[in-house]
Amino acid sequence: MEVLMAERANLVFHNKVIDGTAMKRLISRLINHFGMAYTSHILDQVKTLGFQQATATSISLGIDDLLTIPSKGWLVQDAEQQSLILEKHHHYGNVHAVEKLRQSIEIWYATSEYLRQEMNPNFRMTDPLNPVHIMSFSGARGNASQVHQLVGMRGLMSDPQGQMIDLPIQSNLREGLSLTEYIISCYGARKGVVDTAVRTSDAGYLTRRLVEVVQHIVVRRADCGTVRGVSVSPQNGMMPERILIQTLIGRVLADDIYIGPRCIATRNQNIGVGLVNRFITFRAQPISIRTPFTCRSTSWICRLCYGRSPTHGDLVELGEAVGIIAGQSIGEPGTQLTLRTFHTGGVFTGGTAEHVRAPSNGKIRFHEDLVHPTRTRHGHPAFLCSIDLYVTIESEDILHNVNIPPKSFLLVQNDQYVESEQVIAEIRAGTSTLNLKEKVRKHIYSDSDGEMHWSTDVYHAPEFTYGNVHLLSKTSHLWILLGEPCRSSLVSLSIHRDQDQKSAHSLFVKRRSISNLSETNDRARQKIFSAHFSGQKEDRIADYSDLNRIICTDHSNLVYPAILPILAENSDFLSNLLSKRRRNQFIIPLQSIQERKKELMPCSGISMKIPTNGIFCGNSIIAYFDDPRYRRMSSGSTKYGTLEMHSIVKKEDLIQYRGVREFRPKHQKKVDRFFFIPEEVHILPGSSSISIMVRNNSIIGVDTQITLNIRSRVGGLVRVEKKKKRIELKIFSGDIYFPGRADKISRHSGVLIPPGTRKTNEKESKKVKNWIYVQRITPSKKKFFVLVRPVVTYEIMDGITLATLFPPDLLQERDNVQLRVVNYILYGNGKPIRGISDTSIQLVRTCLVLNWNQDKKSSSSEAARASVVELRTNDLIRHFLRIDFVKSPISYIGKRNDPWGLGLLADNGLDWTNINPYSKARIQQTLNQNQGTIHTFLNRNKGCQSLSILSSSNCSRMDPVNGAKYHNVIQESIQEDPLIPIRNSLGPLGTSLPIANFYSFDRLLTHNQILVTNYLQLDNLKQPFQVLKLKYYLIAENGKIYNPNPRSKILLNPLNLNWYFLHHNYCAETSKIMSLGQFICENVFIAKKRPPLKSGQVILVQVDSVVIRSAKPYLATPGATVRGLYGETFYEGDTLVTFHYEKSRSGDITQGLPKVEQVLEVRSVDSISMNLERRVEGWNKCLTRILGIPWGFLIGAELTIAQSRISLVNKIQKVYRSQGVQIHNRHIEIIVRQITSNVLVSEDGMSNVFSPGELIRLLRAKRMGRALEEAICYRALLLGITKASLNTQSFISEASFQETARVLAKAALQGRIDWLKGLKENVVLGGVIPAGTGFRGLVHPSKQYNNLSLETTKKNLFEGGVRDILSHHRKLLDSSLSKKFHNTSHNTIHQTIIYRIYNDS
């Protein structure tokens, strides 16, 4: 007993946690020492002990064990503070969106990581035996990052595209997630349930493909006799010691190892732990080991090249199916790999920059000419040095020199005082490494509506010369000047002053308009009923956004209703005024609102009809009158009478709708009577079919319940029709007759019967008193009856003449103007008319048609321009419709009846709706505008008003559409220069006519492009803003005015203008600081003790105040593309800028299983094959230079295949190791050997054996070359595992994998033979598999292969470095081969890869 105690005392006692890795090591050492049987006993005891202890101690996990880290609160608060500052900088336009995204991700990632590091120390201090803490090292799901999500914070998540979502999840799972955090978390937490399911299937399929490639590889020989090996060097320290040991243990040496003269290990010796330790201790020369790559066999492997069996630690047995073991060793751990893409999402990797810190306090000095200013990735200012830069730091007693490498960012200024350890420079990481970058585009969208403006020059992207994509050449701001775009070009606003001229565009609209689509001529036309206009102040703009498309294309016109003639007490004044009119003007007075109330005729009397461009052609309708006698409240249909009885109008000559511009004779045919057949119609939604209480074809009385909330207004026959999404329920009033004979009825179906006709189908015949409409109803096949419906007859009378509409004195001097009255029927024959919610239906419309005598001599067509003039007398506002005749050469675009309206080009450039945007013709016109402008000057001193008319001589303009140059000629005011410098003037932006003084500045309206700015009188501005101006001109910071797209109309809200009142002391300096048109970023202080300004453009500078139009800055860096044109209107959500930035696509985007699969299928993006091709060329060039042509190709190709194999093994191992999965290299090597051992036969060689383009095994090609004694030309090829499975020697194996029919058909046509060498084909056919015990029955005793002596002929062809490159190949060419080789023609060898160095047999 004492002896035992003494022995035990000598044993080493380990007080350590044994994890999985340590357990593996323990078991392998036990097997080495005691063998398999004894080890299993020991392990049983360990198992029993473990279960006993676990039962005794048993930890439980409760929710209270999840202790949140105390420092979390202030860490998160700090990060939030940083994010807030970042957000402000973005708002002020100091950083752009990409920089903001990068910075915010870094802030939150750092916070999350810091919390994670805090976690373990916190547990150790507060509760070392906490179950959560104990479990956090158990591996699998119990690792630090899982626990971090429970007690730290969940952190940043990726979206499905792998982009980071920059909103971090601040809560942990213990605190619980908010709704937003939960949704984001669902994005990132794919790797939960879904991942596990997907991963299992993916890993299963990967295993299947791997096994398919290598199922035939079995250990068949003891030694293949190869002299080649792969060299592993313990000297250079490139490989970590752990990996070196893993690589070496279990292998077989390919060469003797010497230390000095002493041999410490011999060829074919098994490497154990002791030997490895000696190698590491002695730092031996590179060790050459045998691997599956070096084995000389074609379809099997030898014991020595495979090495030790992982199960029992001895050399592998003959007949072992090592291929299948390899496939499963790689495939099975696939389920442990994650499918996740790592946290970085690639946004800030490649940017973990190294920092240079100041060695001491002091002033920093450097050569300023060697650096130029730039921005860092986060948008901070910095200097970029393009060459090495020497920086000196002068402290009190010492000078420090710091060398900063090229392409680094200097973060301090010259002569700045720096403190010790302050970061002074950032070295760009990844300049030397080969990690690939991917280009990413990020679009920035507009936050608000407004006009685009940029403050720098841009140039067209070369591929978008005609598009609207511009590239920025330097860092600058893009501004969106806020304003609400008027989505329709039909309505505009003007500030309405006394005696101003108003064009037809600027009528105020008081109520929102309603839209009513009426069916006419089988084509939907748009009628817009808008409300009255007046000069009153409380005006709102009409909402036309929904009608915009229809109006623009269909060119229907706004209808301004209810303007009646004036019959007022002061008409003598008016006639005096109007009698002076010239020949080319025609003025119609209109009624004002005050008088309309006194009128007996209802409001909807005469409605004005003015085209959108204000231009009339001949024969236009200028007004219409809806006669109340032809108005119905109920639905029904119109009939023009039957063709038999009243053949007045042929069907195709039906009266057309009012929208035609010119009347052809057929439209003026008089219809002296028409008929209206009333019916009651209810349109119900399709879902309400259940609630209808009456049946189809039933007869009901008045006030019958039809549905739950509708009662019938008339009695009669019910018809229910189902349309697509609705139900039409009609009630026809009338009498029902059951006829005697069918033939009479057929004549009277759907016809109108005049009075006096006898009803023949009754016993006693009565005469019909009124018109009736006979309609045949067939409820079922056998039954039918006739419905006789009452008809309302309308006679059309020519009661209305011009004399009833206008005072006679106005109609005397009509000169060449003709007005005619024409009646229309608005609805076609038999068309159903639907009344919508008790609105009345107008059946006949009386139209006023304007025409004038055309001047036949002149070729140009004469057009009339309409405008509304307002005159105020005795505080009574009068409106006149003034029609001016202008002679103008009008350019027509395309065909006469093009789909965009009449194709007229408006002479004032405002009627853009008519321009056909697809027309290629150049449109050039010079228009002489005979339009006067009534304009008042307010002279405050005299207190009286004077009237001045700017006539057409004062404003003219040339407007070629493509040249877009504007010549502004306004007498005695402006030089002929389209860019007006106005930088230093007071007054609103865009004006250059100081009238009297700037207090009485008034609106000047001309048709000059630059001055058409409806500016407001400044006195009005100080009142609460109601309606602000229509259109601004953009002014650049250099003081030039740019006229933006004349189509755009911007309305400004009161919210968009900021009015700042300045103290009078600051006025003088303010006007210097602020020039008109200047852009101001937010947070600028204009005066002391004043609040900072909002960002915007200065549009008005006065003595005591400034008006700033709100604008939002967007920062853009060089290379960004700007969408849209200068001055273009942007709506909220439109793309403004696209940034192109690089993010590194290092190994962390695809991870885990997808990555392994990518490598094995050889289709990775940074594809190995690409690298290999480059590498081949590189090797070939270098070696050709060193060795001359034939040698170069020969050795280059061999090295390429060796390099690619090693590279593939390393890539696959890297993925598994990163996930903590250990796989022995030899398994991966067996797989890689299979996918790299195929070659493609080139065109020019071996034509008698292989066809060009055929895939053959590398060793087969070599053997064939030896047999035929000629050089073979082929290319090395990387096949993916799927392709390799479909290119094996066995067609049965291929057919059982994929594409069975194709493989078998091809094999039959080629006459392939399957030698049944692999396992799978034998399983398919039910034979004995050639592995394990089945292998011994196949092998016949033969002459031992490895008794052959190996000749080694040493030639000093290669010395030093080249010998290293060639991986210590023992056997080089003997002299006979080299002679043969040099005799081969020069051309054959060129550009071919020839594997003939090693004479293998």
From Swiss-Prot:
Cofactor note: Binds 1 Zn(2+) ion per subunit.
Binding-site residues, Zn(2+): 224, 295, 302, 305
Reaction it catalyzes: RNA(n) + a ribonucleoside 5'-triphosphate = RNA(n+1) + diphosphate
Cofactor(s) named in the record: Zn(2+)
Keywords, comma-separated and alphabetical: Chloroplast, DNA-directed RNA polymerase, Metal-binding, Nucleotidyltransferase, Plastid, Transcription, Transferase, Zinc
GO cellular component, as recorded: chloroplast; DNA-directed RNA polymerase complex; mitochondrion
Catalytic activity, EC: 2.7.7.6
SUPFAM superfamilies: beta and beta-prime subunits of DNA dependent RNA-polymerase (SSF64484)
One Pfam family recorded for the sequence: RNA_pol_Rpb1_5
One annotated GO molecular function: DNA-directed RNA polymerase activity
Annotated localization: Plastid, Chloroplast
GO biological process, one term: DNA-templated transcription
Entry similarity comment: Belongs to the RNA polymerase beta' chain family. RpoC2 subfamily.
Record's subunit section: In plastids the minimal PEP RNA polymerase catalytic core is composed of four subunits: alpha, beta, beta', and beta''. When a (nuclear-encoded) sigma factor is associated with the core the holoenzyme is formed, which can initiate transcription.
Function per UniProt: DNA-dependent RNA polymerase catalyzes the transcription of DNA into RNA using the four ribonucleoside triphosphates as substrates.
Protein name: DNA-directed RNA polymerase subunit beta''
Organism: Ipomoea purpurea
Lineage: Eukaryota, Viridiplantae, Streptophyta, Embryophyta, Tracheophyta
